[in-house]
Amino acid sequence: MGTLDTKGFTEEQEALVVKSWNAMKKNSAELGLKLFLKIFEIAPSAQKLFSFLKDSKVPLEQNTKLKPHAMSVFLMTCESAVQLRKSGKVTVRESSLKKLGANHFKYGVVDEHFEVTKFALLETIKEAVPEMWSPAMKNAWGEAYDQLVNAIKSEMKPSS
């Protein structure tokens, strides 16, 4: 498993992440797409990082490759957040972390892309569970996301 030590993710943060994820899980396809639409609204140039979007004339909402990609990113991000405290480390499927790191490296992802994604993720969650949203929940999801990003960055090198 891809792992990185997770200091600083508290029991309270875990509870907030789990509670909100349980409320969002059933809508993960729709929320994943919303996340990516927010990312591209904030940083339109980020579309160039995706081969299936580069020359596409199809509206983003109707792109058949964006939807499954967006859902898998949203699911992986949220599942990783939920597992963080239980496992004591960032956990994603076997070899995924190395692959994620290599892909993000290959496509030229930089810190700013991760920052835009974090902002878009927090906004997406806030809109998905407005009745639960609080500064503490924002911090919990922010911490979980930061730890996942640090784990991905630790693997950002050419694939061997």
From Swiss-Prot:
One of its GO terms (biological process) is response to symbiotic fungus. It is found in: Nucleus matrix; Cytoplasm. Keywords: Cytoplasm, Heme, Iron, Metal-binding, Nucleus, Oxidoreductase, Stress response. GO terms for cellular component: cytoplasm; nuclear matrix. InterPro entries: Globin, Globin-like_sf, Globin/Proto, Leghaemoglobin-like. The record marks K138 as: Homodimerization. Binds 1 heme group per subunit. The gene is MHB1. Residues 8-157 form the Globin domain. GO terms for molecular function: heme binding; metal ion binding; oxidoreductase activity; oxygen binding. A motif (Homodimerization) lies at residues 41-45, 111-123. Induction: By hypoxia, but not by cold stress. Repressed in roots colonized by the mycorrhizal fungus Glomus sp. R10. It catalyses: Fe(III)-heme b-[protein] + nitric oxide + H2O = Fe(II)-heme b-[protein] + nitrite + 2 H(+). Homodimer. It comes from the Eukaryota. Constant level of protein accumulation after induction by hypoxia may indicate a higher turnover. This is Anaerobic nitrite reductase MHB1. Its EC number is 1.7.2.-. Belongs to the plant globin family. Phytoglobin that reduces nitrite to nitric oxide (NO) under anoxic conditions (e.g. during flooding or in waterlogged soil) and upon root nodulation. Required for general plant development and during nodulation, especially for the onset of symbiosis. Monitors nitric oxide (NO) levels during early phase of the nitrogen-fixing symbiosis and buffers oxygen in functioning nodules. May not function as an oxygen storage or transport protein. Has an unusually high affinity for O(2) through a hexacoordinate heme iron because of a very low dissociation constant. The keyword Iron applies.
